[in-house]
Amino acid sequence: EPSAQGDRCKYAVDRPLLPDASAYFGDAAAAQASPLARELLSIAGVESVLIADNVLTVTASYAVDWPALAIGNVIRKHLTSGSPIVGPEYFEDLPSEGDLKWAISDLLNREINPAVASHGGFVELIDIKKNNVFIRMGGGCQGCGAADVTLRQGIEKAIRGLVPRVGEILDTTDHAAGRNPYYSPSK
């Protein structure tokens, strides 16, 4: 399922790939623990791979013709090969939940919240589970038509710049309940 911008596509498979965990690979060097991510990152234009439960999210550096990349074929071939999706070494030296919570809270307070405050918004860290980050947006960010762009291009990039091995970054915001969004969502 491609994103509206065409730079991200989610592939759901019929089995858990990483139950109760996630792994993010922003380049081939980071993908040494995942033969599948390494192969996907070797495809021209592929910028990152996120593996979580039964979904692979592949991001390109620009809008691409997803069917032409044949990523589904690569995934199917790998699933039948018997090779691990992500080796155990990926999870061996992840930062602790406490360290992640401290670092991300500090980042939100120091950089992210001052930036979104100009639009009347704020972002709060709700929880860390393993290496997954749960946030909530409020004020002008809640229900804002640009909230997804803010999350993906601002918040996510800042968090991954600080802690590259963070897994999923999940927005728990009830955007439909936003009372004063900075930009009205398009219908």
Stretches found by the model and what they are:
Residues E1-K187:
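Domain-level signature for proteins that mediate thiol-based redox and metal-cofactor handling
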